[in-house]
């Protein structure tokens, strides 16, 4: 009986340890919630050259297509939906971006 109690206790402890190891929370980078801007170069009314990129939108709940000029450096601008979602919401990345890359 003592052996059974000891084994049951060890099993519970081991189970709790595995739960803590597997439950590491994802911490979204702060730049995922920053406004992306438009990438205009100084003196431009609008970007002369712009490309379709992706930016994470907290209010939308995922990444959205975004026109980005060639100037400025911004971390919340990604070349593909999958790279945007993998960085900012990895749990939903593959299903959210299905067909967009």
Curated annotation (Swiss-Prot):
- Please state the gene responsible for encoding this protein: HA11
Q: Where is the signal peptide?
A: 1-23
Instruction: Provide the tissue specificity.
Output: Expressed in female salivary gland and ovary.
Q: What is its main location?
A: secreted
Q: Where is this protein localized, as stated in its record?
A: Secreted
Domain called BPTI/Kunitz inhibitor: residue spans: 32-88
Name a GO CC annotation attached to this entry.
Answer: extracellular region
What is the name attached to this protein's record?
Answer: Kunitz-type anticoagulant protein HA11
Disulphide bridges, residue numbers: 32-88, 41-71, 63-84
Q: Which residues are glycosylated?
A: 53, 73, 92
PROSITE patterns attached to this UniProt entry: BPTI_KUNITZ_2
Q: Per the record, what phenotype accompanies loss of this gene's function?
A: RNAi-mediated knockdown results in decreased feeding efficiency of the ticks.
Which terms in the Gene Ontology molecular function aspect does this entry carry?
A: serine-type endopeptidase inhibitor activity; toxin activity
Q: Which InterPro entries match?
A: Kunitz_BPTI, Kunitz_BPTI_sf
Give the record's keywords alphabetically.
Answer: Blood coagulation cascade inhibiting toxin, Disulfide bond, Glycoprotein, Hemostasis impairing toxin, Secreted, Signal, Toxin
Record function comment: Anticoagulant protein that modulates blood feeding of ticks on vertebrate species. Delays normal clotting of host plasma.
Where would one find coiled-coil regions in this protein?
none
């Amino acid at each position: 009986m003592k052996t059974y109690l000891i084994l049951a206790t060890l099993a519970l402890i081991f189970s709790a340890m595995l739960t803590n190891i597997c439950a590491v929370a994802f911490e979204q980078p702060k730049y995922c919630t920053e406004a992306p801007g438009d990438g205009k170069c100084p003196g431009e009314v609008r970007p002369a050259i712009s490309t379709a990129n992706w930016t994470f939108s907290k209010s939308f709940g995922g990444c959205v297509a975004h026109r980005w000029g060639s100037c400025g450096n911004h971390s919340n601008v990604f070349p593909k939906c999958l790279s945007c979602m993998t960085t900012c919401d990895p749990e939903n990345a593959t299903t959210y971006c299905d067909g967009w890359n």
